[in-house]
Amino acid sequence: MNSFSPTEDTIAAIATAVSPGQGSIAAIRISGSSAIETSKNIVDVPGIQDWSTHKVLYGHVTEENRKKYIDEVLILVMKGPRSFTGEDVVEIHCHGGIIPVQKILERILAFPSVRRAEPGEFSQRAVLNGRLSLTQAESISELVSARSRKAAELAINGIEGNIQTTIQSIRKRLIEQLTEIEARIDFEEDLPLLDEKHVKNEIVAIKKDLNELIDNAKRGSWVRSGLKVALAGKPNVGKSSLMNRLSKQEKAIVTDLPGTTRDILESEIVLEGIPVTFIDTAGLRDTKDIIEKIGISRTKKTLIHADLIILIFDYSSGWTNEDESILKQLPVNIPLLIVGNKSDLMNDQSFEKVPKYILKKENLVILSAKTGNGEDDLINYLLKKCGSSQTHGLDIALNERQLDLAKSTTESLENINKVFDEKLPWDFWTIDLRQAINYLGELTGEDLTENLLDNIFSKFCIGK
């Protein structure tokens, strides 16, 4: 880790989610040299209670005149370096709700020595003070925002240091190869010949390990961000019924009137650890209704950003020119699944009303949103699309920042292979090798500037 100037000011922020009328407990976190003294100045603690480290005290936060209580609280005292940030930390736990927690924070921030914390600043101080690695801090943020158990599991693995250990091991192997090469450049006459074949083989092996991490990151992205599935089709083909069936909730209004859905509705389920968000869109058709037109416009924007589009048609009535027109309007770069709904209403003529080129499609599922018949086929398709079976055994998954740096590292290693092939001098070998080492150092936080750290932690939530 680079050496940055120590933090001198004291910071404070609400450390828990706060909503009106929700949550029985809230916490305010204070970190810095004046954290304990500030807390003593706003809290009345009855009896003889010890403010020594790792103690819990009971008391009341008072108004500035010390005559009125703001709230009844518990005070957790953690003196540095044995705290989350490595500094003196005090957490004040009060009753939940907006008013008490805001009044206590305002009371704390009234002291000149304390300022409001920036997003992620507590975690940033923990990294700067050596309490956490950068990847551990990022994993804490991932845990807070986890939308499934698998995502939380991956985040915990990162907090335990799995990402840091893995990347550091790869970086160490690269440093060993760089050391061998540079030693031959500086002291060629005093050392045995460089085993060029061994160096090349080791670079290939390292690149293979990195590519596995990159593949894992792609699989992990489904676990983290989930799959966005847009339900498209003409009005009254059962889009809303299908979403209600899949989500097990009455999210959308279901009627026999075409054009009932005029806005974008969403519902989320978790399939084997992967969040899947279904987006029920307004039916695509020509209409003079102004409100419905707005809904259709939003539908087209939603389709562009979906991971998968499910085009639904009425299987009992057959494939129509309107269905064909909608198919041609869909983005060609988004994966498509065609679903024939209302199979419970089909008759002998239904099959003949669907073109053979539609029936032959591998991405075709026939079902009934009303009865649930065929629902398993749709779920299995989604699981296959997510690659959920591949998430079993997935221990670590890089986030977007880490993934970009891992890709840059492999590009540098690929450049080294070109240098090998062109039989260039050893000096050329070291250029990309050193760059690859720097990329991995940036990934783990061992080779970072303060500006880069500020940028990374600005994406964290306040209070973390």
Swiss-Prot record:
SMART domains: RAB (SM00175). Binds 1 potassium ion per subunit. Its EC number is 3.6.-.-. GTP binds at residues 236-241, 255-261, 280-283. It is found in: Cytoplasm. Mg(2+) binds at residues 240, 261. It comes from the Bacteria. Keywords: Cytoplasm, GTP-binding, Hydrolase, Magnesium, Metal-binding, Nucleotide-binding, Potassium, tRNA processing. GO terms for molecular function: GTP binding; GTPase activity; metal ion binding. Its cofactor is K(+). Gene3D superfamilies: P-loop containing nucleotide triphosphate hydrolases, Probable tRNA modification gtpase trme, domain 1, tRNA modification GTPase MnmE domain 2. K(+) binds at residues 236, 255, 257, 260. GO terms for biological process: tRNA methylation; tRNA wobble uridine modification. Residues 226-387 form the TrmE-type G domain. GO terms for cellular component: cytosol. (6S)-5-formyl-5,6,7,8-tetrahydrofolate binds at residues 29, 91, 131, 464. HAMAP family: GTPase_MnmE. Homodimer. Heterotetramer of two MnmE and two MnmG subunits. Exhibits a very high intrinsic GTPase hydrolysis rate. Involved in the addition of a carboxymethylaminomethyl (cmnm) group at the wobble position (U34) of certain tRNAs, forming tRNA-cmnm(5)s(2)U34. Belongs to the TRAFAC class TrmE-Era-EngA-EngB-Septin-like GTPase superfamily. TrmE GTPase family. This is tRNA modification GTPase MnmE.
